[in-house]
A protein has these predicted regions:
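Active-site bordering "gate/hinge" segments
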Residues: 4-205
Length: 205
């Protein structure tokens, strides 16, 4: 068995385990009355407020907005795969947890389909060691686990970017905290902040 075949086989096994684990999470945690009491109707974020603050990713979808760049833009072959975009109803901590667990399953389904449809031939593209980008500017968006990432790049024709600005998901998502914490109980602080799943490296711009 070649390395590629073994990698595909092991990846399929791993994805099946992810799907199985997500199902266990739903049964053991999602149905737990204590967990539901601590997360339902806690840290509610409406769709209107989420969109006004530029929130994206699972947090936006948990508020009932079916927004995903993989289906809205024309990058990578996502249109060739069969998968769902999980959305919430109440925009609370429970929905944000629930959407993420369901997205684990959908991501695993995409990986399994990608392996089954992988064309034959070399896996690595032949690219030059040094890429000289033409003079100009561009902005590219991509869907990431925590939300939308944006890259604004200016090239002066040299070997590196003249200017690079990165818009991170966490930077926008964490900006909603003052709204979500208004009137909240102190014990709810950890649940609300945890449900945003932000990374400080993303927030520090």
């Amino acid at each position: 068995m070649c390395i590629r075949d073994r990698f595909y086989r092991d990846t399929k096994v791993a994805m099946e385990k992810v799907i199985e684990a997500a199902d266990q999470f739903q049964n053991l945690i999602g149905g737990n009355e204590v967990f539901k009491k601590r997360t339902k109707n806690v840290g509610v974020l409406t769709a209107e407020t989420a969109e006004a603050y530029g929130v994206s990713g699972p947090i936006l979808r948990a508020s009932g907005v079916k927004s995903d760049l993989r289906t809205q833009t024309d990058y990578l072959p996502y249109d060739q795969f069969d998968y769902d975009i999980p959305v919430g109803e109440n925009g609370d901590c429970y929905d944000r947890w629930d959407v993420r667990v369901k997205e684990m399953v959908e991501s695993a389904k995409i990986v399994l389909q990608a392996i089954d449809s992988m064309p034959s031939g070399p896996l690595q593209a032949k690219v030059p060691k040094v890429i000289k980008v033409p003079k100009g500017r561009t902005y590219v968006r991509a869907e990431n686990p925590k939300g939308e990432m944006g890259y604004y790049i200016i090239s002066d024709g040299g070997l590196g970017p003249y200017r690079l600005k990165v818009r991170t998901a966490s930077f926008s998502n964490v900006s909603i905290l003052p709204i979500m914490l208004e009137g909240a109980l102190l014990p709810d602080l950890i649940a609300i902040m945890g449900s945003l799943d932000f990374v400080l490296g993303d927030v520090d711009r």
